[in-house]
C-alpha cells in the first residue's frame, strides 16, 4: 500500500490545464521531491494532496484510501493525517510557539499532559525547547522554519508536505536546515513530499524526484 | 506639509478655540462651566443613556456584522456579494431615513397598525431604546461587515490552511481566523461605538435623550457656548479613549497581510445547512434593510409627494450634490497627501496627523460645527464664513480620516520600490507623485472619492449648523421639514436622498468597469 | 458671556487669529470653487424656528411682493429652536442674521437678555395688544397658538378648565404631553407663575394622584382623545384644529374662560431684529411684513390655524378671534425665567 497515490489527475484553472493526466505513487518513508519550473503546477499538486483542492478528474489516495475524486473531496484536510510546511511558514502570529504546536493536538482531543509531553519531545528535536513561550515574530528566520517543521510533525503525520520552505533563506541556513530535516527523517521515518524549483535541494533531499513539465509528470 | 496645515486649521484650531473659550468665563480663567455642567446629574444621565445606546448598538452591529462578514467572505453561501451590497445600503443615507422608514411601518398610523391594532405598542417600542438600537445597529452594521470582509480577504490563506490540516472549520474559525482578524473587528467596533455616541439625526427623530442631541438642546448647555463645550467634554473623553484603543489595536500587533493577488482562500462548505442559512440571511436583510426602505418607498413614491418634495427641496438636493462632490474631490486630494505622509513617515510626528484625522472623524458633528463657527465667524473672514465654503471646511475636517485611510490602503498594496525606482531614475518629487504614485493609487482615490461623497451627502449635523442662510442641503431640509410636514413629503424627501446617493455611485460603478476593462 | 468677555476671548487667542490670516490662501481655492456669495445687495437673512412647512410660504410671498431675496435658516423639530438659537449665539460677534422668527416669545426674550437683538417697533403691529410685545420693542408677537382642551364627543364629563386634570371625577380620563418638552413646559411655567410654586407643585401631585397619562407629544395626546382611549387633553390649538378638520370626534373647549379663572395660555410667534445684522433695513421690512394683518390671516387659514393677534382679522371657523378670548395674563420674560426655574421640579416629577 502506497502512502500517497495520484491516478490520472486533471486540474484546470479558468480553462488552462495546470495539471493534466498526472499519476504517481509515493511509498511509505520515501523522500520525494516534486520539481519543475514555476507555473508547472507543483503547488497545485501539493494542495490537492493536502485536501484544499479537489481534482477535476482522477483520484487521490492517501494511505490506500480514496480521499478525493472527480471534483469531490471525500476526506477533508483534517482527516488526512498530513503535516505541511508552507512556503511562507504560516505560523500563527497570535499564538506562542507552544500554542502553535498545541493546536493540532487539541483538535485530536489529547489531554494536557500528553500534549505537553509530545510538544516537549518535538521542540527538543528541533532544538527550540527554550522558545516555547515566545511569539513567532520574535524568532529568527531559521528558528521560525524549525517551528513550522515542528508544528507539522507534532501530530505524527503519515506524510510531511513541504512547499518550497527554504526559498527565502540564505545558503548557509539552507544547508543547515536541509541537514536537520534529513536527520529528523532518519529519526522519525515519515514520508516526505518536498516541492522545490531548486535542483540542489532536489538532489540533497530527495531519494526520488518527480519532474512536472507541461502540466505532466515524469518520474525520475 | 500643506496637508498638515489644512487639517490643523480646519480641525484642530476650532477645537482649541472651543476649549479655550469654555475655560474663559467673564474675562478670567475659570472652571465654572465645567463645575456646573459636569456637576449636573442630568449630564451624567444623558451620558449614561448614550453609553447604553452605543454599547447595545455596537453589540448588535458587531454580532450581526461579524457573522455576516464571515458568511459572505468565507463560506460558499450563494449570492454573497449581492448580500454584502444589500446590507451595506444603509451606509448610503443618514440613519434617520431608516428611522422614518420604520416609523412608516411601526408608527401609530403605520402600515402594521392598519392590519393589527398594535400601533401603540410598536410605536412606543420604536420611540425608545429598542427602536434606536435597531435603527443605529442596522445603520452601522455595514461598517463591521465591510471591515470584517476586508480583513478576511486580506488574511494570508495559508494561516487558515495550516490549521485546516488538523482541525475542522468550527475550531479553525474560533481559534485561528477570528483571532487573526480581531484587530479589524475591534477597529470596526470602536468606530461603531464612537459613531453611535455621536449620532444626531436618528436619536433626535426617535426622541431618545442622548448626549449629542440633549447637550445642545437642554438648558444645561443652552445659551452658554462655554457650557456647551464643557458638556461635550465627556464625549470628547470617550472619543479620545476610543482612539487610544484604535492606536493600540492597529500598532500593537503587526500582522502580515496579503493584499490583492489571486485569492486562494478555501470557502467553507455550508453543506446541507446552505438553504437554511441563506433563508436566514435573506430574512435578516429584509428586516434590517428591506422593511425600512419599503416604508420610505411606500409613502414617498406617489407622484404628488415626489413633486412636492422636488418643489420644496429640489434646489437643496442639487446643492447637496455639488457640496458633497466638491468636498469629496478636495478630501481625496488631501487624503492623498496625508496618506503619503503617513506612508513615507517622512515628517516627524506623521502619526499625529493620522490621529488628528481619526479624532475629527469620530467627533460629533455638533461639537465640530460649533467650534468652526467660533473660529471662522469673524468680520475679517466673512468672505468664507458666509459662503458654502464653510460647510465644505466642516466636511473636510470631519471626513479627512476616511479619505486618508482609504488612500493609505492603496499605498500599502504598492511596493515602496516603485517610487524609489523613479527616484533613482532621477524623477523629481512632483513627477514621482503625479507620474507614478497617482496612477498607481487611482483605484484607491476613486474609492476615497465615492466613500467621502456618500458621507458628505448623508451628513446632517454639520449642514444644520454650517450651511449658509438660504443654502441648506437636502438632509438638513428634510430634518427641518419634519416639523409638521406630512409623512408623505418626508418619505418622498428620503427617497430623493436615496436616489441622490445611488445615482453617482452607479455612475462610478460603470466608470470603474470601463476603466478596468482595458487593463 | 457678555460682549466684553467675547472680545477678551478673541484677544486671548492671537495665535488662532494670526494663523487664520496666514491660511487664507489655502481656503481661497475652496472659496474660488464655490464662488463668493456674500454681499447680495437686496437680500435679508432670517433664522426661523416656526415650522418650515408653514413659514417658508410666507417668506416666499414676501420675496414675491418686495423683490427682496430671503435667505432662511430653518430649525429642526427635535432640536426645537436650539439649532438656530445656537447659531445666533455663536454668531453674536459677527451676526449673519437680520431677523429671528421664533415660534414662541421666550427664546426671543433670551436674545434680548443676551444682547443679540435690538429694539424695533413695527408700525404694522400697532394694533396688536401690548401684552404680546416686548415693552422696549426687542421682540413683537404675532400669530399665536393657544393651549386648548380637546374633549372626546362621547366623554361623560365636559371639562372646562385645566383644573379638570386634578378633579377626582375625571380620574384616569385625562392625558397630557410630557411637561419636560415644548409648549407643555410653557403651560406648567405659566401656571406656576400665576399660582406660585406651592400651588403649582400641588397641581403636579394632583396629576399623579388622578392617574393622568403622559404622552410623547401634543399630537399624540389629541390622537388618544380622538380614539377614545382618554376623554380630554390640553393641546396646542393647531393639533386640535387639525384633528377636527379631519373629522375626528373631538370638541375644542377654550379652558378657564369664566369669572375669576386664569384664561387661555397664548403663545405667539415672536420676531426680533438682530443687532448688527448685515441688512437691517430689509430686516425691518420683513418684520413689518410678518406682523401684518395679511400674514396673520394667512397663518390663520394655513394648516397651523394660528390665532391672529390683530383684532378683526378673519379666522377659520374652528378658532375664536382673540378679542373674544380670555387670555392668561403672563409676562413672557417672567415665563422664561420660571421655565428655567421649574426644570428640576418637572424632571423630578417625571422621574428622571
PLM feature spans:
Chain B
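Glycine-rich helix-loop "coupling/hinge" segments at transmembrane-helix boundaries
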Residues: 197-223, 460-487
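Alpha-helical residues within the helix-turn-helix
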Residues: 164, 423
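Short alpha-helical segment that forms part of, or immediately flanks, the ligand-binding pocket
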Residues: 160-161, 419-420
Amino acid at each position: 500500500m502506497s502512502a500517497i497515490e495520484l491516478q490520472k489527475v486533471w486540474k484546470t484553472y479558468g480553462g488552462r490545464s495546470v495539471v493534466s493526466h498526472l499519476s504517481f505513487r509515493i511509498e511509505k518513508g520515501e523522500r520525494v521531491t516534486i520539481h519543475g519550473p514555476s507555473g508547472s503546477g507543483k503547488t497545485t499538486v501539493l494542495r490537492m494532496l493536502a485536501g484544499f483542492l479537489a481534482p477535476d478528474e482522477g483520484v487521490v489516495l492517501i494511505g490506500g484510501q480514496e480521499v478525493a475524486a472527480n471534483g469531490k473531496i471525500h476526506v477533508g484536510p483534517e482527516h488526512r493525517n498530513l503535516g505541511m510546511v508552507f512556503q511562507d511558514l504560516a505560523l500563527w502570529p497570535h499564538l506562542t510557539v507552544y500554542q502553535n504546536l498545541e493546536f493540532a493536538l487539541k483538535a485530536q482531543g489529547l489531554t494536557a499532559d500528553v500534549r505537553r509531553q509530545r510538544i516537549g519531545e518535538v521542540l527538543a528535536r528541533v532544538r527550540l525547547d527554550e522558545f516555547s513561550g515566545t511569539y513567532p515574530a520574535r524568532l529568527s528566520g531559521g528558528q521560525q522554519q524549525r517551528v513550522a517543521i515542528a508544528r507539522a510533525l507534532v501530530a505524527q503525520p503519515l506524510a510531511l508536505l513541504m512547499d518550497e520552505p527554504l526559498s527565502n533563506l540564505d545558503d548557509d541556513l539552507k544547508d543547515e536546515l536541509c541537514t536537520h530535516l534529513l536527520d529528523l527523517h532518519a529519526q522519525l521515518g515519515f514520508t516526505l513530499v518536498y516541492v522545490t524549483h531548486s535542483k540542489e535541494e532536489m538532489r540533497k533531499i530527495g531519494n526520488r524526484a518527480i519532474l512536472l513539465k507541461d502540466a505532466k509528470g515524469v518520474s525520475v | 506639509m500643506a496637508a498638515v496645515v489644512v487639517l490643523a486649521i480646519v480641525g484642530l484650531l476650532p477645537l482649541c478655540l472651543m476649549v479655550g473659550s469654555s475655560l474663559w468665563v467673564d474675562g478670567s480663567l475659570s472652571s465654572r462651566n465645567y463645575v456646573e455642567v459636569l456637576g449636573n446629574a442630568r449630564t451624567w444621565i444623558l451620558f449614561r443613556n448614550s453609553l447604553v445606546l452605543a454599547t447595545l448598538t455596537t453589540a448588535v452591529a458587531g454580532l450581526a456584522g461579524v457573522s455576516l462578514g464571515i458568511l459572505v467572505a468565507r463560506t460558499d453561501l450563494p449570492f454573497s456579494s449581492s448580500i454584502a451590497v444589500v446590507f451595506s445600503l444603509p451606509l448610503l443615507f443618514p440613519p434617520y431615513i431608516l428611522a422614518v422608514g420604520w416609523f412608516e411601518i411601526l408608527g401609530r398610523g403605520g402600515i402594521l397598525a392598519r392590519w393589527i391594532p398594535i400601533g401603540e405598542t410598536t410605536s412606543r417600542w420604536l420611540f425608545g431604546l429598542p427602536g434606536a438600537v435597531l435603527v443605529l445597529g442596522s445603520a452601522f452594521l455595514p461598517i463591521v461587515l465591510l471591515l470584517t470582509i476586508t480583513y478576511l480577504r486580506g488574511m494570508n490563506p495559508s494561516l487558515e490552511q495550516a490549521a485546516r490540516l488538523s482541525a475542522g472549520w468550527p475550531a479553525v474559525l474560533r481559534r485561528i481566523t477570528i483571532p487573526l482578524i480581531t484587530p479589524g473587528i475591534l477597529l470596526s467596533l470602536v468606530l461603531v461605538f464612537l459613531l453611535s455616541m455621536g449620532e444626531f439625526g436618528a436619536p433626535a427623530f426617535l426622541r431618545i435623550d442622548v448626549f449629542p442631541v440633549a447637550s445642545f438642546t437642554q438648558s444645561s448647555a443652552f445659551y452658554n457656548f462655554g457650557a456647551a463645550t464643557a458638556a461635550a467634554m465627556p464625549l470628547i473623553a470617550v472619543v479620545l479613549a476610543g482612539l487610544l484603543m484604535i492606536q493600540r489595536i492597529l500598532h500593537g500587533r503587526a500582522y502580515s497581510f496579503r493584499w490583492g493577488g489571486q485569492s486562494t482562500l478555501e470557502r467553507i462548505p455550508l453543506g446541507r445547512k446552505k438553504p437554511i442559512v441563506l433563508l436566514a440571511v435573506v430574512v435578516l436583510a429584509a428586516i434590517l434593510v428591506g422593511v425600512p426602505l419599503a416604508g420610505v418607498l411606500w409613502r414617498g413614491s406617489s407622484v404628488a409627494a415626489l413633486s412636492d418634495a422636488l418643489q420644496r427641496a429640489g434646489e437643496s438636493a442639487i446643492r447637496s450634490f455639488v457640496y458633497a462632490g466638491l468636498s469629496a474631490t478636495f478630501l481625496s486630494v488631501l487624503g492623498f497627501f496625508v496618506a503619503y505622509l503617513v506612508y513615507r513617515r517622512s515628517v516627524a510626528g506623521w502619526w499625529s496627523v493620522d490621529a488628528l484625522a481619526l479624532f475629527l472623524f469620530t467627533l460629533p458633528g455638533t461639537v465640530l460645527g460649533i467650534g468652526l463657527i467660533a473660529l471662522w465667524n469673524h468680520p475679517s473672514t466673512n468672505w468664507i464664513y458666509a459662503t458654502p465654503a464653510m460647510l465644505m471646511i466642516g466636511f473636510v475636517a470631519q471626513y479627512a480620516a476616511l479619505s486618508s485611510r482609504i488612500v493609505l490602503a492603496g499605498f500599502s498594496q504598492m511596493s515602496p520600490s516603485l517610487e524609489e525606482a523613479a527616484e533613482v531614475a532621477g524623477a523629481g518629487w512632483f513627477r514621482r507623485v503625479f507620474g507614478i504614485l497617482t496612477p498607481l493609487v487611482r483605484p484607491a482615490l476613486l474609492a476615497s472619492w465615492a466613500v467621502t461623497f456618500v458621507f458628505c451627502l448623508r451628513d446632517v449635523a454639520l449642514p444644520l449648523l454650517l450651511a449658509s442662510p438660504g443654502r441648506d442641503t437636502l438632509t438638513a431640509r428634510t430634518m427641518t421639514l419634519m416639523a409638521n410636514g406630512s409623512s408623505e413629503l418626508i418619505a418622498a424627501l428620503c427617497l430623493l436622498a436615496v436616489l441622490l446617493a445611488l445615482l453617482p455611485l452607479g455612475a462610478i460603478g460603470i466608470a470603474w468597469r470601463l476603466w478596468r476593462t482595458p487593463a | 458671556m457678555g460682549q466684553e468677555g467675547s472680545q477678551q476671548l478673541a484677544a486671548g487667542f492671537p495665535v488662532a487669529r494670526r494663523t487664520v490670516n496666514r491660511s487664507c490662501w489655502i481656503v481661497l481655492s475652496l472659496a474660488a470653487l464655490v464662488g463668493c456669495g456674500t454681499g447680495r445687495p437686496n437680500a435679508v437673512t432670517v433664522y426661523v424656528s416656526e415650522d418650515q412647512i408653514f413659514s417658508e410660504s410666507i417668506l416666499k410671498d414676501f420675496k414675491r411682493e418686495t423683490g427682496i431675496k430671503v435667505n432662511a435658516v430653518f430649525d429642526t423639530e427635535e432640536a426645537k429652536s436650539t439649532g438656530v438659537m445656537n447659531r445666533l449665539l455663536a454668531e453674536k460677534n459677527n451676526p449673519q442674521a437680520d431677523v429671528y422668527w421664533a415660534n414662541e416669545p421666550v427664546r426671543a426674550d433670551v436674545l434680548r437678555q443676551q444682547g443679540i437683538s435690538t429694539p424695533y417697533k413695527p408700525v404694522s403691529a400697532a394694533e396688536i395688544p401690548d401684552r404680546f410685545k416686548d415693552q422696549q420693542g426687542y421682540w413683537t408677537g404675532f400669530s399665536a397658538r393657544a393651549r386648548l382642551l380637546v374633549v372626546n364627543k362621547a366623554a361623560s364629563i365636559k371639562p372646562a378648565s385645566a383644573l379638570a386634570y386634578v378633579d377626582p371625577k375625571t380620574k384616569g380620563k385625562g392625558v397630557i404631553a410630557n411637561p419636560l418638552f415644548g409648549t407643555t413646559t410653557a403651560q406648567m411655567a405659566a401656571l406656576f407663575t400665576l399660582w406660585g410654586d406651592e400651588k403649582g407643585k400641588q397641581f403636579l401631585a394632583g396629576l399623579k394622584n388622578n392617574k393622568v397619562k403622559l404622552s410623547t407629544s401634543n399630537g399624540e395626546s389629541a390622537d388618544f382623545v380622538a380614539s377614545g382611549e382618554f376623554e380630554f387633553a390640553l393641546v396646542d390649538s393647531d393639533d386640535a384644529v387639525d384633528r377636527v378638520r379631519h373629522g375626528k370626534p373631538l370638541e375644542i373647549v377654550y379652558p378657564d374662560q369664566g369669572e375669576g379663572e386664569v384664561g387661555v395660555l397664548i403663545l405667539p410667534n415672536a420676531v426680533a431684529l438682530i443687532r448688527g445684522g448685515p441688512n437691517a433695513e430689509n430686516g425691518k421690512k420683513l418684520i413689518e411684513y410678518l406682523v401684518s394683518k395679511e400674514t396673520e390671516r394667512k397663518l390663520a387659514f394655513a394648516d397651523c390655524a394660528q390665532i391672529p393677534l390683530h383684532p378683526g382679522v378673519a379666522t377659520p371657523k374652528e378658532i375664536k378671534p382673540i378679542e373674544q378670548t380670555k387670555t392668561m395674563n403672563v409676562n413672557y420674560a417672567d415665563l422664561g425665567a420660571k421655565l428655567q426655574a421649574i426644570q428640576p421640579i418637572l424632571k423630578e416629577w417625571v422621574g428622571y
